[in-house]
């Protein structure tokens, strides 16, 4: 009997210890997890609602969008000139100006923009280089005397001649260099460089070695750089203004014609002289050589000029007029 009581006591003690150890373990777990917060999600991100499409509506194709753009471009022009300085360009045709009006606007732009009054004035010409079937005018370089020169420096001109008296005449008339074979050798050795080169006809055979070196500046009859009147050639090239067609674009010529502080009449006279010289390089009976002309300053936009009054007209002989009649 006593043995049975002792066994029951041991079992109760063991059970009590097991229960206490379990309680301690659970309390330790609770103390560790006090600071842990488990977020409860009470909401969800709203999903994008599908676009409501009307019955019968269709998405525009790229062709339809292009048609809409073309309709905008084809909007009829407004009548007259814009009344304000700010306007939609597509609603008005591009303005075409007389030379006097264009010069007046350039001077006005300079005042409004607070730019230099002595800035350069440029003439941009687009040319029709066609001569006939598969023939074009070659890009050319030319020198002319402007009615109102504006360059601050005189060009350096070299004169080729073996005649001692002609060398003296050249030096007296302002030639930078003058001579024969000795001058040719110095140019060949790059000891001398000039802006322009002129020659008398007798020395031309000896100049052949300089043809590639001088390139576009090589003396030619078509450029009036070969002749016997040395003072006249020097007068042209010392104060002359060079114009040339862009070799890359082949039909574009850009040149400085004046400064903005010159009078309107002086700028117009220089412009007319340049156009006359350009038109000399293509027969007049083939039609207008100059297709478009823009006048601009260093800081302004280009103003489209009315070109027809500026182009030289073909003079018909009386005999040809009778034949036409």
UniProtKB/Swiss-Prot annotation:
Pfam families: Ribosomal_L1. Component of the mitochondrial large ribosomal subunit (mt-LSU). Mature mammalian 55S mitochondrial ribosomes consist of a small (28S) and a large (39S) subunit. The 28S small subunit contains a 12S ribosomal RNA (12S mt-rRNA) and 30 different proteins. The 39S large subunit contains a 16S rRNA (16S mt-rRNA), a copy of mitochondrial valine transfer RNA (mt-tRNA(Val)), which plays an integral structural role, and 52 different proteins. It is found in: Mitochondrion. GO terms for cellular component: mitochondrial inner membrane; mitochondrial large ribosomal subunit; mitochondrion. It comes from Homo sapiens. One of its GO terms (molecular function) is structural constituent of ribosome. Belongs to the universal ribosomal protein uL1 family. This is Large ribosomal subunit protein uL1m. Residues 1-50 form a transit peptide. The gene is MRPL1. Keywords: Mitochondrion, Ribonucleoprotein, Ribosomal protein, Transit peptide.
